[in-house]
Amino acid sequence: MVVKKTTQEPKSIKAQITRASLVVAAAAIMQEEGPSAVTYRSVAKRANTAASSTGYYFDSISDLLYEAGDYNMRSWARRAESVADEAEEMDVASCREHVVDLFLSACMPADTGTAAPHYMQLLAASESGAVTKAYRAGRIRLDAAIGRIIERVGLKDVTPRFVIALVDGAAVSAVSEGESAHRRARDLLAEWVYPVMRRDGLLAEEHGSGNGN
């Protein structure tokens, strides 16, 4: 699927603000209800603009969905990059001690109440080729940020995608069972990473017992 850039590029500051507000509105709707809920009318209502404005700035819903998906992905990448910055500012021992919290903060929304909607909308992304395209493209930055944490901790033979898959898998299973996504992901991260770090001499034997709590 090819998503072309809209031909209606805003020229004035006011127009740029209006267009940006439409992207933000679409991104919010997508996070709350999934791509299928993003329509010209729903986005205009959310952004408090004229219904015709959405069609003016975007050639199609696919164009809008792509930009909304890109907006969401960049937001998640910035969150992960901020956590990676924090990890690199720590001394190595502190970074290793807090590795579970760092991975969790980089991979999941901080607000525990948004975990279920977050993962439901990720699963719903398959409804739109434009959204999956945006998410695939944006994954590079997210992977790079997780990779920086892995490198700072000193973990060997671990990829960012493994960490993300572990967290996401734990979260989705918890959501499906009506349990805390953050708690399940935290427990599974601790169950995996602490034994690996002790095995590789990155952590004292006594540290990380009891799921890292």
What are these regions (language model features)?
Residues 81, 104, 122-123, 147-151:
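Amphipathic alpha-helical segments within well-ordered protein domains
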Residues 70-77:
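Short, basic, alpha-helical segments at the C-terminal edge of helix-turn-helix-like DNA-binding modules
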Residues 131-136, 140, 151-213:
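Hydrophobic/aromatic-rich alpha-helical bundle segments in the mid-to-C-terminal region
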Residues 108-132, 139:
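Amphipathic alpha-helical segments used for helix-helix packing
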Residues 21, 25-33, 79-82, 86, ...:
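Solvent-exposed, amphipathic alpha-helical segments
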Residues 1-17, 201-213:
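N-terminal intrinsically disordered/low-complexity leader segments
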Residues 80-114, 163, 186:
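Hydrophobic alpha-helical connector segments
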Residues 21, 25-67:
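Helix-turn-helix
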